[in-house]
Amino acid sequence: MAYYKGAASEGGRAMQLMKKREIAQQEIEFRKKKIEEDLKVSNIESKFATHYDAVEQQLKTSTIGLVTLDEMKQKQEDIVREREKKLAQKKEEKDREKLKALEAKQAEKDRQRKQIQALSFNPEEDEESFDDEDEEEPLEIKPHKWQTEECTEPRIKKIKKNPDVDTSFLPDREREEMDNKLREELRQEWAMKQATLKDQEIPITFSYWDGSGHRKCVTMKKGNSIYQFLQKCLEMLRKEFSELKTVMADQLMYVKEDLILPHHYTFYDFIVTKARGKSGPLFSFDVKDDIRMISDASVEKEETHAGKVLLRSWYERNKHIFPASRWEPYDPTKVYDKYTIKDKCKK
């Protein structure tokens, strides 16, 4: 916006003139928009007016004399129907012309494509052209220079697989299924062997200990637990020892090679692991000569002592006296390299 530089009165007058000019400019723009809108409406109305005028003109020219209102309406409908029919025919003709133009354009494209294909060197097309010709003498066709150059270039060989390469490290579904099947068969075979071993019977010699030994023998299966063994011993001992009539198997202890064996272990556990105690092996349950009397006690032998079956209450009263002072709970992680008979309370 420009500012007037001069007297104050002249400046105020200039401002008024500029405002009037802006208002006049806005009125011109408003009138211009209104005229454009009127022109749009008139164009739309003129299309309908042209159709209506043509129908009215034809109705006037075809009507002669006085006619009734029904005849006038019927004639008007006929003229409108005929007019619409003509307009539809004109539209169909225009559509047909457009379709012909499109077909001609497509035909021109096809013709150009065929010309381009005819220029390409296609050996199959050459063979077809030779078959169509009559039997003539074969012509010797010399290859072009660029064709001979391409033929002389070495072709890149495709990479092939070497059948001698070891592929055992690669994943193979069939091999994995075979391995899993073999593992399952071996597992079942091993389980059957273990079940057979656990079902084997062994004689177990034991001694009921109440300060002195009372040797007995029972037959058990390798898969039986120490608790089951104590139950069977208790049934046998109740007939001879009155103090055991009200006792349960939980109140008994089984001491083998100076180790107190827990009730949940089985004889199979000691046999398979070849467990060793403080004074002899735990995997043999029959009784032979005392291994402590053999000169070479450092050599592992299967001779063993009879295990002791006793009341837990007796052990609690006498655990400070030999031989109970040597006894200790069984620990599978502890290794006994040498057998000993020395009392742990004596120095």
Swiss-Prot record:
- Name a single GO cellular component: nucleus
User: What start-end ranges are recorded for coiled-coil regions in this protein?
Assistant: none
Bias (Acidic residues)? 123-138
Task: Output one GO BP term.
Answer: chromatin organization
Q: Annotated region Disordered: where?
A: 77-142
- Write out the biased-composition intervals (Basic and acidic residues): 77-113
Q: What family classification does the UniProt entry report for this protein?
A: Belongs to the FAM50 family.
Q: What is this protein called?
A: Protein FAM50 homolog
- Organism per entry: Aedes aegypti
Q: Write the lineage as a comma-separated list.
A: Eukaryota, Metazoa, Ecdysozoa, Arthropoda, Hexapoda
